[in-house]
Structures are given as structure tokens and as C-alpha cells.
Amino acid sequence: MVETDRTRVLIDCGPDFRQQMLQQPFRKIDGVLVTHAHYDHVGGMDDIRPFCTFGEINVYADRRAAGNLRQMMPYCFEEHLYPGVPRIHLNTITPHRMLTINELHIMPITVMHDKLPILGFRIGTLLYITDMKTIGHEEMEYIKGIDTLVVNALRFEPDHHSHLVVSEALDFARRVGASRTYFTHICHGMGLHEEVNRQLPHGVQLAYDGQTIEW
């Protein structure tokens, strides 16, 4: 979740969304950015319904993911909505076309999740990427000047067909030139948090649930 004094934006809404949000103040969600529509990234979307107390929630996704969401949650997009369903306004977004949510200026970029193009998001000097395996050279133009990187790093080994492993994530962090890098989307085989952090270079660490990063 990206949060300022006046704006709150989710990046993806996984199955544990409700559990995570029980620990946070109950306030308006100004938007949900969807990287892609695999269940581990959108499986908690129905649980945004309490936040519709504050009004309709804007969800931003590319054309493919928007279509997937309509199939997964058809009851949210019918002409006559059943009382109590999540009130979602689905916005189709395009890579490299800036979108603005209140004071946040957000640049979607394309990364590859194996053969599936998905979205990453640049917000100021923060870059958030998940489920990436490769990135096109042309995308690097849109991520110059990044200071803080959040990126997936599944495990040390073996290699994986659709996710970065640690060595690849470290290479990408060096290419980006971020001063701080946080690894996320980690599998159970990675190892213990403190032990892994001791193996990582300066400026790189594993992220954890509930962590706050200021940039």
C-alpha cells in the first residue's frame, strides 16, 4: 500500500488483504493498481467492500487483467447491482501513459511474467515490480532515477521460468541503480529472514509484512 497524508493506494489485493488491513486504520482507499489478475494478486478483491462505505473504488488494470476481473467478479459489474457488493469502477490503463490519483503521479511499465506481459508501477522515485522474469530494454527509459526498488525474488535456486531468483533480482537492482532494494514475493524455501539478510549486499534486504518504507 502506498500512503500519503491524504491518499491511499493499494498495489494488488491478494487473498490475505483482509488480514493485513485489520492492522491498519479504517480509512478511504483512493485506488487499487493491479499488476495482473493471477489469484495471489487479486484474490482479496471482494474484501474491499467495507471500504465502499467511503464511495466507489477506482481499480486500475490493463485490458487483459480488466477482462479477467470482470469474469472473476461478474456480480460487481452487472447493470443492477445486488445490495452490498463491492462498488468498483474499473479503469483500463496503458503502459507508459501517466495516471494521477490525487497528488500521486503513477507511471505503469511492462515487465514479463514468463510470456505474460504484466504491469509494474513507478511512483516518484519508487519502483514496484512483482512476478517479473524479464524486462525489455525500452522499459529502462521509464525507470531512470529510481531510489527505492521493491522487486520479486522467489528463492536462491533453482531457476524459475516466470519469477526472478535472487541472483537475477540483484542484477536488476544494480541495473536500476536504486540505493535501497526490498525483495518480496518470496517462497518458503528462501530461508530464515535474518539469515538471508546477512547474505545480501548492503542496501538490499527482504521485505516483511507490515513494513513501512519512506521515500
Show which residues each predicted segment covers.
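Cap/insert and terminal regions of metallo-dependent hydrolase folds
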Residues: 135-215
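Binuclear metal-dependent hydrolase catalytic cores
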Residues: 1-129, 138, 195-215
